Amino acid sequence: IIRLKMKLKKSPLAPTKFPTLPSVKGVNIGTSASNSKYKRRQDILTITFNNPASVAGVFTLSQMPAAPVQFCKKNIVNGYANALVVNAGIANSFTGKKGIENNRLIASYFSKLINSRQKDVYICSTGVIGEQLPVAKIKKALKNSFLGRKKDFKSAAKAIMTTDTFPKASGKKIKIGDEEISIVGISKGSGMIAPNMATMLAFIFTDALIEPKLFQALLNLGVRDSFNSISVDSDTSTNDTVLGFATGEAMVGKNVKPMSKIGDKRLAKFREALEDVMKDLAIQIVKDGEGATKLIQINVNNASSISSAKKVAISIANSPLIKT
């Protein structure tokens, strides 16, 4: 087994400091070390919710999606989540039936640990492809992570890093009516960054009260203009995943109806803040592109449609002549 020991030089485009983030009501964070691919670092992230959270997701378009992507895509139709589990270092991709079974074993173990249905637990993996997950080590780490669930978003962002040179996070606090709403996102990614996301994971958390179908529609739009609009090396991954979780705890129990329709007047502020967070995360991923020393934004004017404008922009972004 290859041990990932090398220390990566921090990107020259990295932010000078980690952002100050608001707390998100109903989100409990734990991290731990499985000692499976990395030594002496946290590589397991568990996030549990006080109550079932609305969930939305966008996944890789690769025709060979990794085992955890297949698992999440099956679960997402239920619309709600009790927990998120992420392991860094091993992607559980191109691992066949055993990889699918290992993913199921981990989900089954954690769902029993938190007294949840398995279909309400979401699993994500990132790292080296072609290796099986060390299930016993991960199970032990999951228990430690869950029992120590008093970590912050910075710890969470660090735990999911692989070849990243800095932890990535973004947050917004807005007011909807009389209620203060928080939106926080974390992400990882630095190589295999191409449109239709990248070798990347991104997780968005909010305490807004929003129905799953509407949340999914907003996430789709947000991904289109953020993670699906970046490129470093034009390669797409098998594990790309963006998941959004809405606990509703900033609004629930206050005689406030959930946001459920696109015409809801409260939605404008929320959508704008959500897209700001996602765009910030996407830009941070590009700034951490392997070997990147420059960041450019391509603007296309007078195109006949958004899709045609994007085709032009992507062809420019992926051109070796432009990059050199």
Each language-model region and where it sits:
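Glycine-rich, charged/polar anion/phosphate-binding loops
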Residues: 24-34, 54-55, 168-172, 185-191, ...
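A glycine- and small/hydrophobic-rich beta-loop-beta segment
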Residues: 244-324
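N-terminal amphipathic/basic leader segments beginning at the initiator methionine
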Residues: 4-60
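Glycine-rich, mobile lid/loop segments that gate access to catalytic sites or pores
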Residues: 104-105, 109-227, 232, 237
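Glycine-rich phosphate/pyrophosphate-binding loop regions near the starts of catalytic domains
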Residues: 44-105, 122, 194-217
